[in-house]
């Protein structure tokens, strides 16, 4: 109601956003003629002038109109592409730290150059984030001529790069890379033992391409650096064998909405009988409950060719949003091992977390964050609440001509597929290309078999054939082409009507500087083929004429195909099922009708589809039965469309709640991570950490006095225990209660005496060993102990989170309990850390003749990178005594401290 009133008074949000953007665009346009009049040298020197103005205190906002006008002119001169006004709007929105929603084919990559260039002038580095290595490299190379002309350096991060290559890439003004690489490099930077080993600079400004995919679809995916665990894998095989013996409905119940499986009372008894145990929920069987639960999910919730595929003896997760395989990614909490046992492949050992972060918390570290996508408006609430990002919808340069037809709904999946087959045959007969969207490999293969049986030639794009992705997408716009794509596989590559424009690659690789060749290339790009043909005749060699002839021939073939597809109605999108998120459906539709091209779309649904079956309304099914509809008859009505929209909104709301809830849990770890990494960086950045150690000594002394000598009555003190502690540090402390009885504040006097004695001992030790050796030694001791304690704490927190759900049975809030217990555990871990560092510092011994060990400067990589499976809650718990007393093998800090640490441990 309030929104409607505001809309009447102030206009819609879209209108309000445009009112803010249009005056700035006019200001940019007013500068176009003066910028156009500059020669190349003057134009390229603009960067230097802008930087000087920033140094003098001018803001980026005030430089924006000139900077954007400069980029527009440079783009035209170097690449032949001039930014449209709507792209200027997109660039302004990005610079403001917003999400620019721009439809497919509107030129998001070119739009980003505006905000990227402007923010690079600040000198703090700009990160451009893409969904895969290919797009990072493609976009960086594609836009590089603009940046090169302006004297702005560009770096690209690729998965297979070594440490030194990464340092060079991050040192550039602009760095392109994937969300995974940026996140993992951040974690690794917080595991190094020397500040020069860090690769990233600051987190100043990031533009995230396909922002909905990264910040929403992958929000529940933690990045994890792990080390090996000693846990055996035979338990997974043992538990896997009992699942086929359990009956659904009697022993367990499947909750498809929550994607969960719950044991019944009868099921618990049955499991106890099969495993020959008395009580499944006895403390010693906590892990067993967890593994039974995960095995049930592996068998009853997770399906092969839908959630994962088995390739070369390995279980590979399928991205539910793109249909792509996610190599190297594993489900967490033993679920992946349970699926491996189910599929009878080699079971990998569970790993132990050394460092982790979610994309939600990584990207919230940036001073300014922005994003681009074709579909963000439906998730505007989540972007605002989680990331404080506004979605600004940018109007298309040319209005969309695509015709979106109403959904057709059938009673059964069989009827639906028959109708789809009929429609595809009809479309292909008139040479209209069709992109068929499915939500799983399983469904795409069912449809593929039906098409093959009907003699319809087609291509399939899913996780099993993703290597051919670029080629299949490039040809999806050919006359009569039928392409089956799982979800949004191929996103990031435009489907061009008429098929791949191969001649463009030929033009780009033809580097001849001859003036006639240049004119020929320009006329081809403008589709002026008659003039191009006359230029070909004037070329001075047979070799040039032959190449020009090949290009002309290729253009003519494409143009003929292009016109044929236009006449047939453009690309038709045929959705075989509605996705849980409207945004994914909109992405599929958005593949058609780019830049004013004609196109059409329609979704075919059945009451047996997952969305309709699990979340849909029973009224639709009842209506179809009541109407006594014959087999094969479809229904098109507003009521059905509204019911589907409501179902999708319910699922979107449910998924948002899950992501928000998980973030509240992850925020607990994030606050702790910030404290640890800040402490670590303080050690790395300072050669002399004696002030930090002195503070630890004071805290340790204070804790010992509070523990053993409470209050101001010396007669009640346990001086013997205090003396025992001080002897362990070799303090040679002489104390007698008599000397403190006359003091006005006996406890304070005791603290001052013990503290000053400890500090004198600390200083004399540094003098004896040699200050240079001592500085290096205590920094290495600090980092080794910090990394070890942090790893142990992560292990304990993982198990706390895994079992915290059980407090719900006693009517306590699991999140509140997790925060309370997590805080207590962290407080204890920090106290133990300080005590251990002080104890180690006082006990370490180095012979008098020791020389300063040469500090190792080479970088050493530690741990395995895992993009974890979706975070989720599971059964099973670990009691506090087990988690706090865990024995974890110490691993070296990255950076090469192994030899030094070994020698210190021996001396200790």
Swiss-Prot record:
Main location: membrane
UniProt keyword annotation of Metal-binding present: no
SUPFAM superfamilies tied to this protein: Helical scaffold and wing domains of SecA, P-loop containing nucleoside triphosphate hydrolases, Pre-protein crosslinking domain of SecA
Acyltransferase keyword on record: no
Signal peptide: none
Compositional bias segments (type: Polar residues): 874-884
Gene Ontology molecular function, alphabetical: ATP binding; protein-exporting ATPase activity
Gene3D superfamilies: Helical scaffold and wing domains of SecA, P-loop containing nucleotide triphosphate hydrolases, SecA, preprotein cross-linking domain
GO annotation, cellular component aspect: cell envelope Sec protein transport complex; cytoplasm; plasma membrane
Highest taxon, organism lineage: Bacteria
Transmembrane segments: none
HAMAP family referenced in this protein's UniProt entry, alphabetically: SecA
Name the record gives this protein: Protein translocase subunit SecA
Source organism per UniProt: Leptospira interrogans serogroup Icterohaemorrhagiae serovar Lai (strain 56601)
Gene it is expressed from: secA
